[in-house]
Amino acid sequence: MTATASSPLESTDASRAGARASVRYTLTLGMAAASGFIALSYEIVWYRAFAFVSWGHPTVFGLLLAFYLLGVALGAAGSRPFCKPRGDAPSEADDARALRALAGFVFLANVVGFVVVPALGRFATTNWLPAFGLVALSAGLMGAVLPLVAHFGIAPDDRAGARLSYVYLANIIGSSSGSFLTGFVLMDAWSTREIGTFLALVGFAMVAVLAFLAARKKPLVLGLSLAFVAASAAGSVAAAPKLFDKLYERLLWKTKYHEDAKLVHVVENRHGVIAVNDYNQVYGGGAYDGAFNVSLVDDKNVVERAFAVAAMHPSPKRVLMIGLSSGSWAQIISNLPGVESVTIIEINPGYMELIRKYDAVKSLLSNPKVQIVVDDGRRWLLRHGSERFDFISMNTSYNWRAHSTNLLSREFMDLARGH
C-alpha cells in the first residue's frame, strides 16, 4: 500500500485558501448585517414621509410594504446573472468581480434610497403616488445584495445550509438594529434630513469597504474608486439642504404649494411630525390638528366647543382630556369656573415644545391645576382603573386615519365610561 503525501506548497495553498474563505465569510456576515440596517432604516424614513403626505391614510403602509417587497423580490431575481458558479475555491479575481458587483448594487441602492423622500416632496406638488416606484427601485437594488452576498461568501460544501442560516441571522440582526436605532433613537434626536444624510454616509462607507477589498492590489483603480465614493458622500452632504428644503411644506400643501409657502415650526420625534403654519394652525402627521387660539372673536379652531363643557356639566371639578394638541381646549377648560384639576394624556411630547412658544396657551404648562402625562390614552386608563372624573374630553382626529379606532372603538368608549 502506498500513500501520497501532500507537498509543502500544496499545504500552503490550501491554508491560504482556507484563510481567504474565512475572511470572505466574515465579510459576508458584516455585509448582510449592514445591508439590513440600511434597508430597514430607509424604509422607516420613507414611511414617515408617506404617512405625512397622506394624512396617515391606513392604506399607505400596506402600499409602501407591497412596493418594497416587490422590489426586493425583483432585485433578488435580477441578481441571478451575477451569481455564476465559482467553484470550491474561488480565485482572488473571482472575489474582486463579486465585490465590484456588490459595490455597484449598494451604491445605486443607497443613492436612490437617499432621494426617495426629497423626490416624494417634488412629486407631491403634482401627484405623489409615482414615488412608490422609487421605493420599489431602491428596494430592488438592495434586494439583490443579500443573494450576491450569500453567493460571494458561502462555499458550496456540506456546511452551506448552516452558513446561509447565519447570513440570514446577521441580516435580521442588522434589520432589527436599524428599526430600533433609527425608529426609537435617531428620530428622537435628528430631523428627517439628518437621518437621511446619515444613512447615505453609512451606505457610502459600505461601498468604500467593498471597493477597497475589490481593488486593494490595484493602487490606481483603488484610488479612483475611493475618490469617487468620497466625492459622492460629500455631494450628498452638500446637496441635502437643498434636496430637503421645504420638504414638509410640499408634503402638506401638495398641489397648492408655492415657493412662498412656509411652516413656522416643525417638530420631529419618534412619535411623528407636527407642523405649524403662519396662521397658527397645527398639523399632526399631516392632518389638521387645531390651532393656537382661545378667543371666540377669531374662532379659527371652533373653540366654542370647549366653552360648551360648562353647559354640559353643572360643576365639572375633575376633568380628563385624551389628547393635548395645541393646548387651546385644555387652556379654556382648565380656567372654567369650578374646575379643580385637569389631567391630560398626550402621547407626543412635541406638542408641549410648541405650546411654550405661544402666549395664548403657554401658561397651561405652569398651571398648578393641570397635570400633563406623556402616555398612550388606552394604556393610562387601563393602569388607572380607580381614577374617576366628572368630564372626559376627546377632540379626536378624522375617523378614517390609521389607528383612529384606538380612540373611536366601542371598546375604548366602554373603557373611558368606566372612569
Q: Language-model segments: which ranges?
A:
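Alpha-helical transmembrane segments of multi-pass membrane proteins
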Residues: 1-419
